[in-house]
Amino acid sequence: MSFESPPSITTSLHNTLLHISQNPYPYIPNPPNCPRRASVALVLRIRPSRNDLPPTAPQIFPYPEPPTDQRLANFFEQSWVKNGDPELLFIKRAAREGDRWTSHVALPGGKRDPGDASDKDVAVRETSEEIGLDLRGERCVYVGNLPERVVSTSWGSVPIMVLCPFLFIWICPAFPPLQLQPAEIASTHWVPLRVLLSPSVRTYEYVNVSDRFAKQGGVVVKTILKPIIGKMRFSAIRLRPSESLYCSSTKEYFSEESQPKKSIFERAYTWFKGGEKAQSDRPLLLWGLTLGMVADFLDQLPPHDSVELWEYPTFTSPDIRIIINLLTRNIKKRNTERLRGSAHDGTGNQTAMDGETTAVAMLESGGPLIGKNKTKEHAVGVMLEGYYDAMKKGVWIGAGIRLMSTLALILWLVRWYRLRSNRGR
């Protein structure tokens, strides 16, 4: 009996890119009263092995350029590519007050301007403006798109934009030096795909979401709920870059003398918590919207289980977590079965969520089928369908139980003190 060895990651990557290029995902129109669109670029490259260096002269394609499948075939047939290490480019956004995604690990990209001809042009323009990388020309191949997502806030109820991811691969051995935009980008990081696919780097991000409840009940409710519900826990990947570039003018890495000094009470509170890490000392965590889009891509690579990178968000307080699990048990079971049935039919990973927003991959209903990723089905939040309402209900039930328990304890202590005082007379 003979056993075939599994394909290398570069061979799997070639097959995946070929599939994506031949099976585009559909265009998603904006929901009513939601005119904004944004695009991001997933940029791949192959890092050569020390034992198989590329030729000094780059491969030049004749003009006009061959079709995408031929360009990919010519690129992946080279020895240094077969033995190389595929990597994906990430950015860390600069710290900006009032920015929903301040200091987040993300993909290069931004919102669409009136002068942009297409969503793809937005990704190309923003990548050039943010990190100085030109994705046009013979040194880079545009592969295709990934599922577009409707990004919503207020726990999935208010759409704010349509997010469009596009995939590119750099096919030249030499990579140009990046020029980071200090006002927007703190650093860039190349992370091997084998690291992103490894279970050992999976972790969690913890976010304070009491501000969400403040909108419903005011500052008093926020102050009461903050110690009661704890922090919200999200799935994450701890990035281990092979190469990083830092923008030396950003305040994440160099403190400013003009920053106001903390009061003695603030310093005492920081000391009580065990100190406060600088931005540069914090781990690079991939989570939220960016994790959802990256999981869409990684799930098409062996072992095709990157959707498991995502877990249902929950809270750190054990009792509230138990209540949420009880309320959402049947919902999660139902949605997981639906996702398994559509994981590779073009529906993709349906979930991406961070502390403030949710991104749901959507597909057009009806219309002609063009390739495998065109589907008749209108998929709207397979994994998160019904979960938000149950989770919010669980939070309020848990908070109510804690408050009633606290009041009961206070009443018991008062009664006990009065009885003890009466006995002493």
Question: For each predicted feature, which ranges?
Answer:
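N-terminal leader/linker segments that precede catalytic domains of diphosphate-processing enzymes
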Residues: 1-125, 129, 133-163, 167-177, ...
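NUDIX/MutT-family hydrolases
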Residues: 180-208, 280
